[in-house]
């Protein structure tokens, strides 16, 4: 039995009056007696061998200024047996000891102690307070009456009466008000942990061991305990904080005093972790599906396996059954997803979806993956999804990959890849990419060779196949060794580089339309380049603020001789989009079917403003242009370049005020005196959940998926508090070229403190004649559940700077991540 320290707290009033303790019952062995209040007194422990003792009186305390009694807790004495406690060590407390404090204490230590008046019992981090408290040491039982309050760490339970076996954590609490707090992992990797509190009221709370509670006719919520906006009301409520699971029997979810979700039996997460059970429904609507109702069932099979079974009713389409299975092992992870609609009410056809993603660490050096996706028809996503990012998918990947890392400087991989191409618009068919059956790759990079050289290698063998018979097929072998000599000093660098790009093709048949086309083709192209740059710095001051300004000119020379390539099919090659990412590239084409001839010099200059105290970049401006010394001869189907210089590229980005940022990009054609491309974005974001954005896009020669040429649109978006917990959010994108609205989002959010409600409407046009509309309605109960269809991901993609206004649960609904 833990050692017991008895510390009576006596109160001295005005004029020297004293409150004497109630004497303890007589005992066979005389105990210590209470000394006169005028003499010095030491607080002493009662040794475990003493059957009874009279309580010593505490030293007199100063009276309150008003002459009234001023209670204060005396410091407990040491628990060391057979030794007196001095005032110097009175604050020491032995771990596991039990301390009883009160204004009056009477009784026999080894039988029963009765503490009255501001009574306290403390053992380690447990503190039980009440008007009156009885402690029975033989059974370690505490009985408390009147204003009872139990605190253990951050947990607090209060009520009129309680009984508790302290060591076993068993007992009962009558009519309790309780609040239990636990630490939950951060919302994102690297985020600090946060506190999650749940509490409520009950007729009776039963302690059933450490971290185990059972409550009768109880409520539970993450809102304020005394006035919750939402709560779970249950006939029987079990809270298991070891497994972090709550079980409600005969339960109902109540929101604003209105019952809206009945749970005859349900498990729910106490701190947001995954739990098996029927999940709250997802309700939405779109013009493609009509009423859209989903009632998922989540099955937490094991800590590393789970599944979700998702019946979905669509008013215009019918009943769909979906499922997802996720798994995780020491060396593997993945998920399987399937959807089945037996008969679409509109098309009259069966519609299905299947998806598999698997990742496998086979050995310490060998890694494998599978990514297989497929649907039953071309219109599957457009008809059955309300998300623009999904509805606009056209190529579904199907691939298997093996990667071998031989050492820190070389690796190899094998790939088998194909696509399912969705052609939902017969008037604008999408070209199906070539299959790679297989592709073998080797790469290497070895710096710090003798004389400071760096060696790089790229090798490839790939067999191309196509589902359409009118496309040529064949294989390609590539070997590209390179040597460079990086020379870097303070303030400048120069890197000359030389390589030989060798390619061999073996085609099933020659390219149609060429009289001298070959089926066996070799191409050897030497490539030489020099990259160089200088950095200048100076102290500068703009608008009264000190900066470090840099000036960074860069020159890049590239020489690639012409080689005939017009009889090589375009298996995986197209022209890069011109921009700053490509202006210093070695090849103007993607893939390996074209090596662009070049005798050119790229010149660019960048200037930055850097905060000298923090080193952060405040602003950046850059301009660049490429100059050609020879005419272009190699093409990939595009028109030949005739000018001796490219368009001028210019860009500016930075924080122009404390809360405002600007990002611009300009592509200017000096030959035609035309702007080819211009992008402008402005953001004002003074604080969290306050953001306003303005954007403009212009592209003179961009070819749209529908075949139209040119782009010119403006968009505005933002999120802003409206007052009283209300927030507005929205986005408008208007095509100035076609004078039509291409996308619109309008939403409103309300932050209720422990819950958030969202309503949003979305309209987008996948093409001028096909407009999809969707409505999202969501009620999110913090750290418990999200009910309805969530617009959050849509808004995050569409409104830069959007902030989710509540501290969201890590999981969507009742534990699904």
UniProtKB/Swiss-Prot annotation:
Residues 1-26 form the signal peptide. Disulfide bonds: none annotated. This is LPS-assembly protein LptD. Residues 1-101 are annotated as: Disordered. Component of the lipopolysaccharide transport and assembly complex. Interacts with LptE and LptA. It is found in: Cell outer membrane. Together with LptE, is involved in the assembly of lipopolysaccharide (LPS) at the surface of the outer membrane. InterPro entries: LipoPS_assembly_LptD, LptD, LptD_2, LptD_C. It comes from the Bacteria. Residues 13-90 have a biased composition (Low complexity). One of its GO terms (biological process) is lipopolysaccharide transport. Keywords: Cell outer membrane, Membrane, Signal. Belongs to the LptD family. The keyword Ribosomal protein does not apply. GO terms for cellular component: cell outer membrane; transporter complex. The gene is lptD.
